[in-house]
Every structure is written in C-alpha cells, then in structure tokens.
C-alpha cells in the first residue's frame, strides 16, 4: 500500500530547465490574484491575433446574467495559429508523425505540407458549399488527415463535430441530427489492432436517418471497395488536386464556435459541448507548453483518439499551436504485441508520452520485459489522463517506464474544461502517486458538501470550480438552458464538475471519481442512462438499470440489471444477444461486462430507482446497502443480492 506520505520531489535538473519552476508557479499564483486581467492577457498573447483583444474576461455564473466570454473583441484564426505562423521558421520541420496500425508503416507531414493539405481540404469544403458557421461531422480513423480535416474546418470557420470511430451508425445519426450538420468527412475504412473498421458503411447506415446530409467527403485509406452514392459522395483523392493549394484563413471572433464534441452526462442524450475560438486555443496552447514543459524539436505523443477531447486538445490543437511535433498512432497498445507502445517510442524518439491509466494497467499485466527490452532513453516526461490512476499503476509507470527518473503529470480535466485544470507542473510540483496535485494558476477549485457549503482544509467532498478559465465550454449546442441547469444550478454560482474529490493537508487534490451517473470505462466516458435506453429498446427488455463497478483493467466496468418482459425466458443466449445489441446501438466500448437478470428493481414508493443500492450490490459491498425499508418492495433487494453476478 502507498500512503499519502510518499512524495517524489522535483528532479533538480528538470526544475532548472523547466518553463515553470516552483518560484515561477508561486509568482503566477500571486500575479493572477493581483492582476488577473494582465495574467490572462499574457496567456492570450501566446497566440497570433488579427485584432488583439482589449476585453479580457466577462463572466457571471449567476442565473440572472449568466455569461462566459473571454477575449470577446479579439479576432484570430485557429488554423493560422497552428500552421501559418510557424511557416517562416519551421516550414520543413515535422508537424505530424504518423505511425500506422501495422508496424513498419509510418510517415511524416512537415508544417509546409500540413499547410498545403489543410488549404486544399478547406478549398474542397468551400467548393462543396460549406460556409462559416456550418457544422461538419468528422468520422475518421486516427490518421493525419483527421487533424487536416479539423484544421480545414477551422480555416474556413466551419464548426467541426468529430465522432469517435468506435460509435455505431445510430450514435452517429444522433450526433448529426442534434447539430443539423449537412456535411460528413469519413474514410473507406479504418484499421485497429489488425482489424478493419467499416467507417463508410457505418456512415451510409447513419445517413438513412439523415436525408438532409447532402455531401460526404470520403478519404481512400485502406483502398477497400466501398459503394459510392452518386451526387452525394466525393473522394478526397479525386478532388484534392482540382483546388488551389492556398486558402486564406477566415478571420474569426474569439467567441465564434470552433467545435462541438458530444459527451455523456448523467441524464438524457449526449450533450454537444461547444468550445469557442480564442479562449479554447489559448488554454490548449498554454497548458500544453506549461504542463508538458514542451521544448522545440521534441516529439510529443498523446495516445488518445481525436474522437475524444484529449485528442482535440493534445494531439492536434495544443501541440500545433506551439509549433510542436505530434505523433498520431492509428493502432492499439497490444497489437501486434504488448511491446508496441514502447517500440514506437524508440522508433520515433518520443520525448513526452501521455496515455490513460487503463492502457497502463493492461500493459502492466503483461510483464515488465515488454517494456524493458526497449531503450526508452528518449523519454523525458510521462503523463496520465482520463480517470484516476491507482498508485500501483502510477508506481509501475514511474519505475518500469520512467526508470525512477521521469516525472508523471497526472492531469485532471474534462471535455467541458477544454484543457487541464488540476495537474502537477513537472518543474514545480512534488508528486504523490494517485494525486492530480494542485490547480493551475487562475483555476479555483473548492470542495463542497451536499448543500454546497465550502469545506476547508483536509477534507472530502464534491469538486466545484468557482471561477472561469479561458478554455471553459460556452454552451450545450442548441440548449443553453441545459448548459446552465447541468453545471451551474446544483451549487448556484459555481461550476459543478460531477467529480468527488479529497484534499489532503498539503492542499493536494485526489479525484475519487464521478458522483453522478457517468461512468468511466477504459477511459471512455459513458452515461448509464444511454446504456439503459439502448437496453430497453430491445424487444425483450421491460426495464434496465446500469451502474459502474470497479474493474481491474478498465477502471470501471458496466454492470446492467435487466428486467425482462413477461413470458420472456432469461437464457445465456439472450444475455449474449443483449451485449451485442448494446455494441450495435452505441458502440463496442459500451457493451455491458455483466448482465444480471432482475425480476424487480429497488424503487422508492414514488417509483424512483435506488441506484445507490444497485451500485453497492455491483461493487459487492453488501454490508453497506443502507436503509432499504423505504423501498416499495424491500424483498427485491434480497433477490438481487442472492443472484448477484460474480465480478
Ligand atoms: C475523469 C477527459 C482522475 C473525471 C479529459 C472527469 C480523471 C472525467 C482524470 C472527464 C484524472 C479525467 N484523474 N479522474 N487525471 N482525468 N478524469 O470528459 O471523472 O472524457 O470528470 O475528459 O474523467 O472525462 P472526459
């Protein structure tokens, strides 16, 4: 066991060379209090503005005059900031390194080449009628053209909505409908772990429900023979050379939308988290520079898919806004062998490596030899993101991958926050395994009790942020009311994160996980309500309740209680069917790990499902079920306990 007492001090050489050492961190904390306007202005000054902002921050979380605006009179273009401004010095420097699913397939794109590809794709979009403000849905594998597609949208002021390649046709259709997007960018197929992903076929299926989508731009990637719909489908390789290799960047207001990214909440359908141009890019850029202590020429590798926010901020926008070199990996950690990550690090001489605890736990189980047979001496810094990292995994990462020398930045943030909020700075913060440590300067976390009362000192509670930061989401697309209700009404005047958290005597934050009905499965964020609605859409299911339970590798697993309709027999074959059904309805990553047949669900007399009890049963915490006497029928609990599925 690891105690809070285990502390890893900042290595002296790192502190000496870091962008931010302990003194600079303290100075930033003091400055943001004394001169917030100046502090935030300097963060924005990292970017190239067509018109620099004079209005820095205008924020109120109060219901009457709720508003979040940063740099609101500034004008800039994101793609110019990520590409054009680097061209004079870095035209021939590598912007993107690509490593394919199969070892031996890799390539690079220089800043000059990236500029040409982005301009050409932007011109294709324009030629097809895409205009500033239009929503473009992107459904692509992890390939450089995914970054190109995002930047091409940004170049002309179109709003991208990237949908993770693991989502099913139904999920894609829902996301296209919600933002009324008329244009889709996809590929014939993707590759993942030696298998093919039928991306274009999924789009064809999804578009049966979205007849208004007029155009699909398809990238030939694997070369598979896929049907094309005349008049609708265009092949990138056929049109790329028909347009100019130059496309002037569209001047955008700082508060113009940059992208929508759908994420799961505790209720209802996924929310379209909307990020805007100036604040988002400033925050992605600054956090990348500060937290990864990025130095010119270093190869940075974030293993997240661009379909999630981590891929947006730290595969594409953060690294490129800094003129950095970002590695895009098409594959998975264990293909063809569990050495793959470490081989890629040696092959491309990666300096900074950023991944998720779930990958580390899976690789840790395969034994140290897969790691230690590689050199790894190019590594300088390690990072973790997406879920709490258990101290065992942290220590393994530190010892086996980091050779007991490399700091690990455990970065806490969310789709909603745009970039990191609570994280160590490698040159400034002593590390405690399992703690995301301290807030970045200007970020104001607090812990509150159920009534919203601030809790002081070493304590545990719900994590809120009491003030804004530039990368904060601005709205839920199409539903501003839902934005306010979801995040600012539980604890009036504060942003509620949905996370539980402990703070120790040193002021270190330890995220304990979600306190709402969101679960984190292999670093993928899922709403239990979404899985429930997929299950009840099956003809045999009367009712379903889904909770998370601790899972050794995935962090959390999906545990589903299912009540069948009268007369339906509960068989193993049906159980398999239901798992397949959820894979098909949402995507493979949402498939239940466990299905328990539930003749009844524990409900209050008013009919509300008591999820707390279901969680305890799934977690095998049978001693702490709490008071069940208020249930409409307490005997259902006995049945659920007796027939609990082993996890
Ligand atoms: C969890 C991913 C502990 C947390 C960037 C949060 C973490 C949710 C950490 C957001 C971390 C993310 N330690 N928990 N370092 N990073 N989380 O929107 O529960 O996919 O609320 O954003 O992941 O997930 P999302």
Swiss-Prot record:
GO-annotated cellular components:
cytosol
Residue positions where N6-acetyllysine is found in the record: 608
Binding residues annotated for Mg(2+), in chain numbering: 536, 538, 541
The UniProt entry, under InterPro entries, shows: Ac_CoA_lig (IPR011904), ACAS_N (IPR032387), AMP-bd_C (IPR025110), AMP-bd_C_sf (IPR045851), AMP-binding_CS (IPR020845), AMP-dep_synth/lig_dom (IPR000873), ANL_N_sf (IPR042099)
Species for this entry: Caulobacter vibrioides (strain ATCC 19089 / CIP 103742 / CB 15)
Xref: HAMAP family: Ac_CoA_synth
The UniProt function text for this chain reads: Catalyzes the conversion of acetate into acetyl-CoA (AcCoA), an essential intermediate at the junction of anabolic and catabolic pathways. AcsA undergoes a two-step reaction. In the first half reaction, AcsA combines acetate with ATP to form acetyl-adenylate (AcAMP) intermediate. In the second half reaction, it can then transfer the acetyl group from AcAMP to the sulfhydryl group of CoA, forming the product AcCoA.
Which residues of the sequence carry a binding annotation for CoA? 192-195, 310, 334, 522, 583
PTMs per UniProt: Acetylated. Deacetylation by the SIR2-homolog deacetylase activates the enzyme.
Q: Where are the transmembrane segments?
A: none
Keywords linked to the UniProt accession: Acetylation, ATP-binding, Ligase, Magnesium, Metal-binding, Nucleotide-binding
Question: Under what name is this protein listed?
Answer: Acetyl-coenzyme A synthetase
Known catalytic reactions: acetate + ATP + CoA = acetyl-CoA + AMP + diphosphate
| Family membership | Belongs to the ATP-dependent AMP-binding enzyme family.
The Swiss-Prot or TrEMBL record annotates one GO molecular function as: AMP binding
The record's disulfide annotation reads none
Top-rank taxon, per record: Bacteria
CDD domains listed in its UniProt record: ACS
* Names of required cofactors: Mg(2+)
Q: Which GO terms describe its biological process?
A: acetyl-CoA biosynthetic process from acetate
What Enzyme Commission number(s) apply to this enzyme?
6.2.1.1
Q: Which residues bind ATP?
A: 386-388, 410-415, 499, 514, 525
Cross-referenced Gene3D superfamilies: 3.30.300.30, N-terminal domain of ligase-like
């Amino acid at each position: 066991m690891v105690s809070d007492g285990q502390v890893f001090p900042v290595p002296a050489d790192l502190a000496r060379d870091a962008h931010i050492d302990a003194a600079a961190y303290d100075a930033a904390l003091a400055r943001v209090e004394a001169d917030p306007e100046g502090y935030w202005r300097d963060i924005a000054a990292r970017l190239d503005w067509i018109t620099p902002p004079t209005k820095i921050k205008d924020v109120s979380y109060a219901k009457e005059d709720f508003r979040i605006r940063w740099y609101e009179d500034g004008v800039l273009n994101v793609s110019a900031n990520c590409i054009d401004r680097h061209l004079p010095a870095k035209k021939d420097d590598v912007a993107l390194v690509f490593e394919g699913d199969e070892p031996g397939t890799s390539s690079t794109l220089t800043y000059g080449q990236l500029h040409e590809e982005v301009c050409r794709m932007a011109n294709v979009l324009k030629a097809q009628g895409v205009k500033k403000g239009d929503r473009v849905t992107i459904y692509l594998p992890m390939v450089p053209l995914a970054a190109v597609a995002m930047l091409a949208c940004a170049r002309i002021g179109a709003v991208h909505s990237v949908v993770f390649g693991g989502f099913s046709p139904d999920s894609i259709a829902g996301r296209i409908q919600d933002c009324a997007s008329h244009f889709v960018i996809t590929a014939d197929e993707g590759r993942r772990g030696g298998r093919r992903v039928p991306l274009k076929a999924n789009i064809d299926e999804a578009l049966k429900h979205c007849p208004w989508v007029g155009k699909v731009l398809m990238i030939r990637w694997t070369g598979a023979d896929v049907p094309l719909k005349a008049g609708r489908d265009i092949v990138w390789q056929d049109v790329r050379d028909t347009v100019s290799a130059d496309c002037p960047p569209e001047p955008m207001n700082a508060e113009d939308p940059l992208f929508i990214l759908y994420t799961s909440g505790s209720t209802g359908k996924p929310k379209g988290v909307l990020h805007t141009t100036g604040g988002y890019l400033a925050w992605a850029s600054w956090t990348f520079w500060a937290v990864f202590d990025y130095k010119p020429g270093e190869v940075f590798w974030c293993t997240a898919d661009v379909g999630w926010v981590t891929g947006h901020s730290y595969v594409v926008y953060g690294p490129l806004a800094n003129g950095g070199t970002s590695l895009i990996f098409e594959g998975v950690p264990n293909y063809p062998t569990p050495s793959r990550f470490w081989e890629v690090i040696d092959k491309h001489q990666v300096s900074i490596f950023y991944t998720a605890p779930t990958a580390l736990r899976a690789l840790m189980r395969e034994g140290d030899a897969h790691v230690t047979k590689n050199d790894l001496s190019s590594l300088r810094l390690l990072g973790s993101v997406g879920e709490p990292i258990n101290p065992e995994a942290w220590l393994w990462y530190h010892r086996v991958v980091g050779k007991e020398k490399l700091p690990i930045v455990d970065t806490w943030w969310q789709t909603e926050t745009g970039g990191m909020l609570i994280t160590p700075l490698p040159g400034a913060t002593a590390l405690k395994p399992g703690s995301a440590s301290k807030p970045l300067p200007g970020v104001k976390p607090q812990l509150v009790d159920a009534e919203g009362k601030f809790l002081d000192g070493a304590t545990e509670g719900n994590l809120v942020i009491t003030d804004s930061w530039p990368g904060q989401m601005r709205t839920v697309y199409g539903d501003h009311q839902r934005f306010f209700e979801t995040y600012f009404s539980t604890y009036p005047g504060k942003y509620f994160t949905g996370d539980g958290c402990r703070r120790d005597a040193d002021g270190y934050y330890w995220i304990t996980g979600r306190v709402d009905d969101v679960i984190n499965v292999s670093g993928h964020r899922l709403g239990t309500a979404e899985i429930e609605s997929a299950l009840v859409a099956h003809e045999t299911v009367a009712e379903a309740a889904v909770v998370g339970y601790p899972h050794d590798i995935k962090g959390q697993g999906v545990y589903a209680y299912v009540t069948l309709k009268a007369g339906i027999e509960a068989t193993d074959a049906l159980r398999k069917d239901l798992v397949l059904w959820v894979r098909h309805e949402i995507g493979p990553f949402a498939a239940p790990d466990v299905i328990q047949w539930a003749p009844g669900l524990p409900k209050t007399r008013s009919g509300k499902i008591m999820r707390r009890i279901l969680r305890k049963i799934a977690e095998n915490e049978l001693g702490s079920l709490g008071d069940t006497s208020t249930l409409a029928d307490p005997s259902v609990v006995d049945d659920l306990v007796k027939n609990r599925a082993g996890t």
